[in-house]
Regions:
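Active-site pre-lysine segment of PLP-dependent enzymes
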Residues: 147-156, 169-192, 196-229
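PLP-dependent aminotransferase-like
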Residues: 106-163
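PLP-dependent enzyme catalytic core of the Aspartate aminotransferase-like
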Residues: 324-328, 333, 337-367
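Conserved PLP-binding catalytic core of the aspartate aminotransferase-like
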Residues: 285, 295-328
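Phosphate-binding glycine-rich loop
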Residues: 65-113, 131
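N-terminal "arm"/small-domain region of PLP-dependent enzymes with the aminotransferase-like
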Residues: 2-66
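Short acidic capping loops at alpha-helix termini that bridge into adjacent secondary structure
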Residues: 36, 86-90, 110-113, 157, ...
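PLP-dependent aminotransferase class I/II
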Residues: 71, 219-303
């Protein structure tokens, strides 16, 4: 007699749908038998791996029979020195997604409330549902966070608030002044996660002093990643800065070897490669101008973005447009699952990759 294993699963897991990542190039090659594919779907760094990282990783290969440093001592030391934080404030993750889930698992219990914005990063609702907690989704304001409404949504049952700045998938950005005022309204018992996965693409003068805020607001956890501007998406390494007591709780639950040896070394190396980071930011700046000028010339509405992607309104259901682009060898990201069925999110690539997308979209929409 068979067993219904779904009935044995935790309540929050039963109706959970897996995270849908951007379509891999290899998958499209298998499906359509085509080559020369351009992938602009997952907000990856188009420059490829930094030369400094390639060299460092090659030298490390002989040590892969050993377990990694479970505490990431040298990476934490480098992060603390670079950003002026204490090593006791740092928690390392297998990408920042790992940390987002870890924070929720530490602080959120069944039936607690978790607040996030409409059109927020899809990992937030997945984490909340997995814990069988209550999601409080605050309607967006101009595709971004309505901080006034989010503050008003806080109740005695609220345990956690997720805020992405810049926001993914819309690219909207909150000023330091607006965030500071919001944090002052949040009760001390409510944790706030500030997800800054794309902060390196923001003009430095506009960025929030988020790490310094942790000393003013001990309930704040700031998460960042090496997957975007630093070009380490395939190695999966991120970090958070929080009150030392919060970091201690996170590290109780964190898997001891969640960052592998190559990831730790790569992150430590690229953190010192200012030239690579500057090139990544400049490439993104030029590519963003290329795509926004194209949209303006074609009369396509888009959401001004502070990230490394542009979200474009197709003026029609975007699903068929996405499929036609796939047939032309261009992978972008449909975001109907974010409540945006007419939009496609397009990662900023190299100039020639952006041109491939624009030529393909011309063929789909205008010919």
């Amino acid at each position: 007699m068979g067993c219904d294993f779904t009935a044995l699963a935790n309540l929050g897991i039963r109706a959970l749908s897996p995270y849908q990542a951007g379509k891999p190039v290899e998958e499209l090659e298998r499906e359509l038998g085509i080559s020369n594919i351009v992938k602009l779907a997952s907000n990856e760094n188009p420059l490829g791996l930094a030369a400094s990282v390639q060299q460092a990783l090659t030298a490390e290969l002989s040590g892969l029979t050993r377990y990694p440093d479970a505490n990431g001592f040298y990476l934490k030391q480098a992060l603390a020195e670079r950003f002026g934080v204490d090593e006791a404030q740092l928690t390392l993750g297998n990408g920042s997604n790992d940390l987002l889930e870890l924070i929720a698992r530490v602080f959120v219990s069944e039936q607690d409330e978790v607040i996030y914005a409409e059109h927020a990063f899809i990992v937030y609702p997945l984490v909340v549902q997995a814990l069988n907690a209550k999601a409080v989704v605050v309607p967006a304001s101009e595709w971004g966070h309505d901080l006034t409404a989010m503050a008003a949504a806080i109740t005695e049952r609220t345990k956690l608030i997720f805020i992405a700045n810049p926001n993914n998938p819309t690219g909207t950005f909150l000023s330091a002044e607006a965030l500071d005022a919001f944090l002052q309204q949040v009760p001390a018992h409510v944790m706030v996660v500030l997800d800054e996965a794309y902060t390196e693409y923001v003009e430095p003068s506009l960025r929030s002093p988020s790490f310094a805020w942790v000393n003013r607001f001990p309930n704040l956890v700031v998460c960042r990643t090496f997957s975007k501007a630093y070009g380490l998406a395939g190695l999966r390494v991120g970090y958070s800065v929080s009150d030392p007591q919060v970091a201690g709780l996170l590290n109780r639950l964190r898997q001891p070897f969640n960052c592998n040896s190559l990831a730790l070394l790569a992150a430590q190396t690229v953190l010192d490669d200012a030239e690579y980071l500057a090139a990544a930011v400049e490439t993104n700046h030029r590519g963003m101008a290329q795509l926004t000028e194209y949209c303006q010339a074609r009369g396509l509405a888009y959401i001004p973005s502070s990230g490394n992607f542009l979200t474009i309104d197709m003026g029609r259901p975007a699903g068929p447009v996405y499929q036609q682009l796939l047939a032309l060898g261009v992978i972008v990201r449909p975001i109907a699952g974010y409540g945006m069925p007419d939009h496609l999110r397009v990662s900023i690539g190299l100039a020639q990759e952006n041109q491939r997308f624009m030529d393909a979209l011309d063929e789909v929409l205008f010919r």
